Amino acid sequence: MNYDHILIRFGEISTKGKNRRSFIERLKQNIRLVLKDYKKVKYFSNRDRMSITLNGENPEEICSLLKNIFGIQSFSLAIKCESKLEDIKKTALAAIEGEYKPGNTFKVETKRAYKQFELDTNAMNAEIGGHILKNTDGLTVDVKHPDIPLRIEIREEATFLTIRNEKGAGGLPVGSAGKAMLMLSGGFDSPVAGFYAMKRGLSVEAVHFFSPPYTSERAKQKVMDLAGCLAKFGGSMTLHIVPFTKTQELIQKQIPENYTMTATRRLMLQIADRIREERKALAIITGESLGQVASQTLESMYAINAVTATPILRPLIGMDKTEIIEKSKEIGTYETSIQPFEDCCTIFTPPSPKTRPKKEKIEHFESFVDFEPLIAEAAAGIETITVYSEQEAHDKFAGLF
């Protein structure tokens, strides 16, 4: 079937009242960014939905990209025709003929936004259904569980016919809720946390701490690949790679062993907070889940958080590890996260980390060490790169070879 349009229905945007227009504009910008290589498409929007005119572009390719865009509740490939009965009948029959097999069932559902149309909804359903039955073989009606639900939307300017309704990613358009920094390691948790933050409308930049030679270039590439996995939900992702070797070596030398993990997390948070301020973000995102590991007890979080007044967002706080892993499989980060290249946190994990550290104690231990020069040095040596989704990166560099 030659589909010529895609109809896009909004998710939570429909509840945003006075801010509705800005949310729709943000979603439109995000869709344009993701579909920027499809030069022929045109966009139209109103209060209830958006439509894309394909103008010959590949509909299946575009649909596969739309599935990852937050703010879309659902979308459908559609055929457009004039709002005239004979045109609708002809188009409906062509749509069914392109989909059905003998033995299939179908149902016609009409939405008549154009109230001056010559037939009402029930009469239209009967008219179109009768026309299809008369001109096909082996097709019957099932109004409860049809194989082919033919939906007809009649508007004054045009009529749209759809058959398949695809589920969208839901949530809010990326960037509609502001910007935050994601502390991105190479594990399962932080990429999933980044996904959920983006789903709630946050524009996310990632911060990764890199400690060569203790961590390898492969570990660095692993994190870049994870950022690329997340980039498909926002078009691209900015990744800040922080040199952390000297800071970790000083921690190991000067801080009691069972408090090294707490000190490491506190210093990471301070550096991430400086990057956040420079990048004009308003929060920091972590992949912490309450009680999952020693650094994620409530006492640890309290002692670590004390170094900043910046909001710390923890999208996974109530999730089990198995739930997080299942989600990582769903969003496409699992296969990268299982690669056996350790990050700086796992390399320097003490044998018996303090699970209930005291804020006063870690502050006492840190008071004997001047970390500020190393924090400044790490901040000055940050490598900032833009990471694209796997497909976009392939397209971007394909012409070079």
Swiss-Prot record:
Cellular component, GO annotation: cytosol
GO molecular function: ATP binding; CCA tRNA nucleotidyltransferase activity; tRNA binding; tRNA-uracil-4 sulfurtransferase activity
UniProt domain THUMP: residue ranges: 60-165
Principal location listed in the UniProt entry: cytoplasm
Enzyme Commission number: 2.8.1.4
Compartment annotation: Cytoplasm
GO process annotations (BP): thiamine biosynthetic process; thiamine diphosphate biosynthetic process; thiazole biosynthetic process; tRNA 4-thiouridine biosynthesis
Pfam families, per the entry: ThiI, ThiI_fer, THUMP
Residues that coordinate or bind ATP: M183, L184, H208, F209, R265, G287, Q296
Keywords (A to Z) from UniProt: ATP-binding, Cytoplasm, Nucleotide-binding, RNA-binding, Thiamine biosynthesis, Transferase, tRNA-binding
PANTHER family per the UniProt record, alphabetical: TRNA SULFURTRANSFERASE
Main function: Catalyzes the ATP-dependent transfer of a sulfur to tRNA to produce 4-thiouridine in position 8 of tRNAs, which functions as a near-UV photosensor. Also catalyzes the transfer of sulfur to the sulfur carrier protein ThiS, forming ThiS-thiocarboxylate. This is a step in the synthesis of thiazole, in the thiamine biosynthesis pathway. The sulfur is donated as persulfide by IscS.
Family: Belongs to the ThiI family.
Name of the protein in question: Probable tRNA sulfurtransferase
Organism: Bacillus velezensis (strain DSM 23117 / BGSC 10A6 / LMG 26770 / FZB42)
Biological classification of the source: Bacteria, Bacillati, Bacillota, Bacilli, Bacillales
Name of encoding gene: thiI
